[in-house]
Amino acid sequence: MAKKRDRIVNTQPFISDDASVASSRKRSKVPKTHQKQEKLIEAGMSEKIMKQALAQQKEVADEENAERNPSSAAFAVAGAATAGEEQKILEEEEDDIDDFDGTFENQSQFDKQEEINEDDEKLFESFLNKNAPPQRTLTDIIIKKLKDKDADLAEEERPDPKMDPAITKLYKGVGKFMSEYTVGKLPKAFKLVTSMEHWEDVLYLTEPEKWSPNALYQATRIFASNLKDRQVQRFYNYVLLPRVREDIRKHKKLHFALYQALKKSLYKPSAFNQGILFPLCKSGTCNLREAVIIGSILEKCSIPMLHSCVALNRLAEMDYCGTTSYFIKVLLEKKYCMPYRVLDALVAHFMRFVDDIRVMPVIWHQSLLTFVQRYKYEILKEDKEHLQTLLQRQKHHLVTPEILRELKDSRNRGEKEDPMVDNFAPVPAKEDRFDIPEVPMEED
């Protein structure tokens, strides 16, 4: 019979309070090449590795999220976009400016243009300001400023600002490049314009009214990310907006690169409102086609609630232009929670037409319907009565009955829900087990 082997006993306990006892063996590893040579990975290579790793982690996380909850996967990107992430995204896009190949992701979707009803367009023209002054551009402003400073330049058609001749020659060459630009890298001199104190004068030398659409798109990306709100507002108002309106009126549609430039301009929503939306409505010459194209950008893109409220309040107080109703309707359909001040301003806006003898366009009635549908519980009782009086004078055979129904079938601001609903709430029965009634029993 074979001899039994002795059991090996470990004298050390499995769990010890002393950290020095529970020491584990370290496996010897072969040193890596850069460790053996005592060299570090270069900063550029390290940054590329980190970017690639983060991209892969995000891709894996998105796939796992899509498997767990397919219905919400489509909205994951939109819901996760915060202000900091938007800044990071824009910085990455700025790094990719030199890689621009002239193509856009959503170009196939843009080809489906919305048709404009000619009758509606003629009705809108009756609300336009016939005596409105022409819109000023950056060139007009700089020329006027130069001529006011120096009377000797009054006879020159396009005078040059007083600068170093080398700088003037350089940026005139940049302007010629921008007029022919389609794809590829932009000159480094152009990227430095945003850091200059007199950037408007330098930009004037490049003749921005002659830039190609793709060049204006690239310029909008650079200016939106590097200039402050007040500065980029002037770029939007005096460079981007005149070019967009000119392109729409000339071709009856908007070049896709200019459309993308408008979308990029929404990165600074305050500057977009002050530089594009408000001047457009204030001009009194915005036609229906311009409103539909620019309004589609507001419809597709996300706008912060605060800026949306400010825009609605300002539009409600402006002198009415037919297309103002279109922008009001688009912003109301965002369904943001509005302050009472904005809601009261909108009521006052609609009540201005109670004595107007003109036939209001359909979009005016639709904007009123949208307002009542979204915020009927936040309108005062007196304001609802005033709106009903308005609807007796401004009628539409299809829209007006819907507005009246919404006004009647809703509670007023400050009122609670119908108290009749609480009467049907179940009341727990009280039972006394010591006071049980006698139950008669039948005898057999």
Swiss-Prot record:
Component of the 40S pre-ribosome. Disruption phenotype: Delayed pollen development with reduced nuclei content leading to reduced pollen germination capacity, and pale seeds with arrested embryo development at the globular stage in homozygous plants. In heterozygous plants, slight accumulation of the 23S-like precursor P-A3. Reduced siliques size with small non-developed and early aborted seeds. Residues 24-34 have a biased composition (Basic residues). Residues 73-84 have a biased composition (Low complexity). Highly expressed in flowers and at lower levels in roots, hypocotyls, stems, leaves, siliques and seeds. It is found in: Nucleus, Nucleolus; Nucleus, Nucleoplasm. GO terms for biological process: embryo sac development; pollen development; rRNA processing. Essential protein required during embryogenesis and pollen development. Required for processing of 20S pre-rRNA precursor and biogenesis of 40S ribosomal subunits. This is Bystin. Residues 1-37, 53-85 are annotated as: Disordered.
